[in-house]
Amino acid sequence: MTGFVVTVAFRVKPEHRAAFREAILENAAASIAGEPGCSAFDVCEKADGSEIFLYEIYDDEAAFKAHLATGHFKRFDALVASWVAEKRVLTYNRLNPGN
């Protein structure tokens, strides 16, 4: 195994999309800068703005669990809880490094 991948799809309530976008970009930057076990944290948005998709790569599942325990993640999660209409989380074992 060459990593642990997490994908998250958020459907955000329209009135909170701009604030959510700002909050997730801040969380992503903090994850890359402050978590040695996080090697990628891509934030993507559907063209119509209706969904935000995250693609995160961690060294292993333990590094992802450490991410969930960080202060910046806990703040983000509490902040956006009422802004999110739907959240889907999937995890994968990465079979090959893409770059």
Language-model segments: which ranges?
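Short acidic, gly/pro-rich beta-turn/loop elements at beta-sheet edges
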Residues: 18-20, 51-53, 99
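Glycine-rich beta-strand-turn "strand-cap" elements at beta-sheet edges
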Residues: 2, 42-50, 77-99
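Short, well-ordered beta-strand segments in beta-rich or mixed alpha/beta enzyme
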Residues: 4-11, 40-68
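Short flexible/disordered coil segments
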Residues: 8-9, 71, 96-99
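N-terminal first-folded block
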Residues: 4-34, 42
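An amphipathic, aromatic/His-enriched active-site/gating alpha helix that lines ligand/cofactor pockets
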Residues: 26-38, 57-91
